[in-house]
């Protein structure tokens, strides 16, 4: 084997190793990325059943239902962005700051029946905080325009009922 062919084999092996390492890193990143979606996006373009997403919006007033399955507490509630609502099923204890009419981010997957199976529920920490993703979803839905002030507070969402959220209408009296 000549010196030139040995060098060519070495360069080829290095490129093959670099390509393999790049493919492995990209595969690891793609399986660990969790995308944020608003309820209207989930309704319009449901993600694959095995795809983990973050669902963010406001908890619809009057939608929280509590059950038990054995010793495990089950919470069912609707999350809305003002245009659509998605029912969330969470097995576990909800955060202390979880309230109807407050912003929430749930991490989980969409079931074949369209319900969202949450593995984690994150509640806001005070009445003025709204997660960046939820505020962005409200802006995109037309429920809030940053040129006209801060995002709507929880009190303005407390008047939205389950029926209004499912039909995309906010009952603002």
From Swiss-Prot:
Residues involved in heme binding: 125, 129
Listed InterPro entries: CcmE, CcmE-like_sf, NA-bd_OB-fold
Keywords: Cell inner membrane, Cell membrane, Cytochrome c-type biogenesis, Heme, Iron, Membrane, Metal-binding, Signal-anchor, Transmembrane, Transmembrane helix
Compositionally biased tracts (Basic and acidic residues): 164-173
UniProt superkingdom: Bacteria
Membrane topology: Single-pass type II membrane protein
Function: Heme chaperone required for the biogenesis of c-type cytochromes. Transiently binds heme delivered by CcmC and transfers the heme to apo-cytochromes in a process facilitated by CcmF and CcmH. Also required for indole-3-acetic acid (IAA) biosynthesis.
Similarity comment: family membership: Belongs to the CcmE/CycJ family.
Protein name in the entry: Cytochrome c-type biogenesis protein CcmE
